Amino acid sequence: MEHKAPLVEFLGLTFNLSDMLMITITCLIVFIIAVAATRSLQLRPTGMQNFMEWVFDFVRGIINSTMDWQTGGRFLTLGVTLIMYVFVANMLGLPFSVHVNGELWWKSPTADATVTLTLAVMVVALTHYYGVKMKGASDYLRDYTRPVAWLFPLKIIEEFANTLTLGLRLFGNIYAGEILLGLLASLGTHYGVLGAVGASQFPIMVWQAFSIFVGTIQAFIFTMLTMVYMAHKVSHDH
């Protein structure tokens, strides 16, 4: 069964209430995790602080693999925020979905191309901003004509391609996972209680476990590519 999105019109613009709700919930969860992990800092970390320090070390490793730390250290907070936000967003639609009057209200916000493409545009725009800020406008613009001027149109195309692939890769993986979970759940309803337990629940649990793995990998890939694109804009050796 196909479920439509809850849409409202305001000042000539169309808003998806489900996306707005899930984006807000994702932000709140990330904020709560960050506050809980840093509420009482200790020299010997335990619990949530230990987890948060592991995340910082992991993102620090991503940055070090793409650019030198003197240049990339300032992007540590950005990287941690991205990987936590995308991971939480990817996980929200896995346990269940909520439908009200044929409208889908609870899902992963990253299962909507509008959300992922908007996030990709914001990230790529940020790389351009830091490219101009750290290298100067003239040196930044000259990068589009290096090593030869005729590469300029190809590099413009590359910028659009990077944005599209960054957003659509995330959307495609998460959306496909939720669609298959929905199909497996509906399979059980067609075969009754025994069929639901035997033919639906086990595949659902297996696919949910795989979707957790995919969602985690996609959060890593999104953050890694963000730092790769950032390195191309801010490093003088790119």
Curated annotation (Swiss-Prot):
Q: Which UniProt keywords apply?
A: ATP synthesis, Cell membrane, CF(0), Hydrogen ion transport, Ion transport, Membrane, Transmembrane, Transmembrane helix, Transport
How does this protein lie in the membrane? Multi-pass membrane protein
A Gene Ontology annotation in the biological process aspect, one of them, is: proton motive force-driven plasma membrane ATP synthesis
Q: Name one Pfam family in it.
A: ATP-synt_A
Q: Where in the cell is it found?
A: Cell membrane
GO molecular function annotations of the record: proton-transporting ATP synthase activity, rotational mechanism
Q: Which InterPro entries match?
A: ATP_syn_F0_a_bact/chloroplast, ATP_synth_F0_asu, ATP_synth_F0_asu_AS, F0_ATP_A_sf
How the protein assembles, per its UniProt entry? Answer: F-type ATPases have 2 components, CF(1) - the catalytic core - and CF(0) - the membrane proton channel. CF(1) has five subunits: alpha(3), beta(3), gamma(1), delta(1), epsilon(1). CF(0) has three main subunits: a(1), b(2) and c(9-12). The alpha and beta chains form an alternating ring which encloses part of the gamma chain. CF(1) is attached to CF(0) by a central stalk formed by the gamma and epsilon chains, while a peripheral stalk is formed by the delta and b chains.
Q: What is its biological role?
A: Key component of the proton channel; it plays a direct role in the translocation of protons across the membrane.
**Into which family does the record put it?**
Belongs to the ATPase A chain family.
The protein here is known as ATP synthase subunit a
Q: Tell me the organism.
A: Bacillus sp. (strain PS3)
